[in-house]
């Protein structure tokens, strides 16, 4: 695992924690001043943000540790656990927002000064957009599942802040139930994001194969290599930033062992150039021992 990956992922986790802490302080003041249930929803979400981002920071630091005697494949699965924990945090906040929205829908409470809430929400929206942009850049560079989960969370915050702005504007003109209605909508959207995030984390923990596009690239690299007659039994998974790739190469029976080994090494290096940092295992099979009827599509 290269130092650039660790540095970028750690910075993203620290930035998210710092931003969530700043926004929490701002929203506490705004809620105290306006009494807006939508801002209360945002405040609770910021509390969850801090818990989730702190968890993310600690788990990311652990996942960056190199492989050891007890963890031969490294600690990358900790990122999936962080994403799963975040989905639980977010689901809890969504339930709270939903129940609070129902309560205020039944008994709406006028806000004292929606203007303050509008200003605070605009500030929160700008800060969150900046954070999400940075996280998206980090995800493009690292493919970190933990940072991607955090980014999805803060993307829902952008949607939420936009909805809060609209709710505050409507409440300003006397539509007091709009505040509660938007809180309900925000809660439903956050719950959807949490379920999607949890599903992706569970799939990673269950060693889901790499995407079809990446597996097809591996097949294309292998089958186009001189000296390789075919390939089968492609198996892939991902743990943190590391892709694990196993494949059997089919070679002519007459090919000397040393030459077969050299071809396998060349194929491995070609795969690593396309997917740096991967753990690649290649097995060489003589064509005569590969039952033709037993060959299956490697994408099946």
Swiss-Prot record:
GO terms for biological process: cadmium ion transmembrane transport; intracellular iron ion homeostasis; intracellular zinc ion homeostasis; iron ion transmembrane transport; zinc ion transmembrane transport. Residues 1-16, 59-81, 137-147, 199-300 are cytoplasmic. GO terms for molecular function: cadmium ion transmembrane transporter activity; ferrous iron transmembrane transporter activity; identical protein binding; metal ion binding; zinc efflux antiporter activity; zinc:proton antiporter activity. It comes from the Bacteria. Changing residue 45 to H: Loss of cadmium ion transmembrane transporter activity. No effect on zinc ion transmembrane transporter activity. InterPro entries: Cation_efflux, Cation_efflux_CTD, Cation_efflux_CTD_sf, Cation_efflux_FieF, Cation_efflux_TMD_sf, CDF_Transporter. It is found in: Cell inner membrane. Zn(2+) 2 binds at residues 68, 71, 75. Pfam families: Cation_efflux, ZT_dimer. It is a multi-pass membrane protein. Zn(2+) 1 binds at residues 45, 49, 153, 157. Its main location: membrane. One of its GO terms (cellular component) is plasma membrane. Cd(2+) binds at residues 45, 49, 153, 157. Zn(2+) 3 binds at residues 232, 248, 285. It catalyses: Zn(2+)(in) + H(+)(out) = Zn(2+)(out) + H(+)(in); Cd(2+)(in) + H(+)(out) = Cd(2+)(out) + H(+)(in); Fe(2+)(in) + H(+)(out) = Fe(2+)(out) + H(+)(in). Zn(2+) 4 binds at residues 261, 283, 285. Residues 31-41, 104-117, 159-178 are periplasmic. Induction: Induced by iron and zinc. The chain crosses the membrane at residues 17-30, 42-58, 82-103, 118-136, 148-158, 179-198. Cytoplasmic zinc binding may trigger movements of two electrically repulsive cytoplasmic domains and reorient transmembrane helices, thereby modulating coordination geometry of the active site for zinc transport. It may modulate activity in response to cytoplasmic metal fluctuations. Homodimer. The subunits are held together in a parallel orientation through zinc binding at the interface of the cytoplasmic domains. Asp-49 and Asp-157 are required for both metal binding and transport process. Asp-49 is a selective binding residue for Zn(2+), Cd(2+) and Fe(2+). Asp-157 is a highly specific coordination residue for Zn(2+) and Cd(2+), but not for Hg(2+) and Fe(2+). Belongs to the cation diffusion facilitator (CDF) transporter (TC 2.A.4) family. FieF subfamily. This is Cation-efflux pump FieF.
């Amino acid at each position: 695992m290269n130092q650039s990956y660790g540095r970028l992922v750690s910075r993203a986790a620290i930035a998210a924690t710092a931003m969530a802490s700043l926004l929490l302080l701002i929203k506490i003041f705004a809620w105290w001043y306006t009494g807006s249930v939508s801002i209360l929803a945002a405040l609770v979400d910021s509390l969850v943000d801090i818990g989730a981002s702190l968890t993310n920071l600690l788990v990311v630091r652990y996942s960056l540790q190199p492989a050891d005697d007890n963890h031969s494949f490294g600690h990358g699965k900790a990122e999936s656990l962080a994403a799963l924990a975040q989905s639980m945090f977010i689901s809890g906040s969504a339930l709270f927002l939903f129940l609070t929205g129902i309560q205020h829908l039944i008994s709406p409470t006028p806000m004292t000064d929606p203007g303050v809430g509008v200003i605070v929400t605009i500030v929160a929206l700008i800060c969150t957009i900046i954070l999400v942009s940075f996280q998206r850049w980090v995800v493009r560079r690292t493919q970190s599942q933990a940072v991607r989960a955090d980014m999805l969370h803060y993307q829902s915050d952008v949607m939420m802040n936009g909805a809060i702005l609209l709710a505050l504007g409507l409440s300003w003109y006397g539509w007091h139930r709009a505040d509660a209605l938007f809180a309900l909508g925000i809660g439903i959207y956050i719950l959807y994001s949490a379920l999607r995030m949890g599903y992706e984390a569970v799939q990673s923990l269950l060693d889901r194969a790499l995407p079809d596009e990446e597996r097809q690239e591996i097949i294309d690299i292998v089958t186009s290599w001189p000296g390789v007659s075919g390939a089968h039994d492609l198996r892939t998974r991902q743990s943190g930033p590391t892709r694990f790739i196993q494949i059997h190469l089919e070679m002519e029976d007459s090919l000397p062992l040393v030459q077969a080994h050299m071809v396998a090494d060349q194929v491995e290096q070609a795969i690593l150039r396309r997917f740096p940092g991967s753990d690649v295992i290649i097995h060489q099979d003589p064509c005569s021992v590969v039952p033709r009827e037993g060959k299956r599509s490697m994408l099946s």
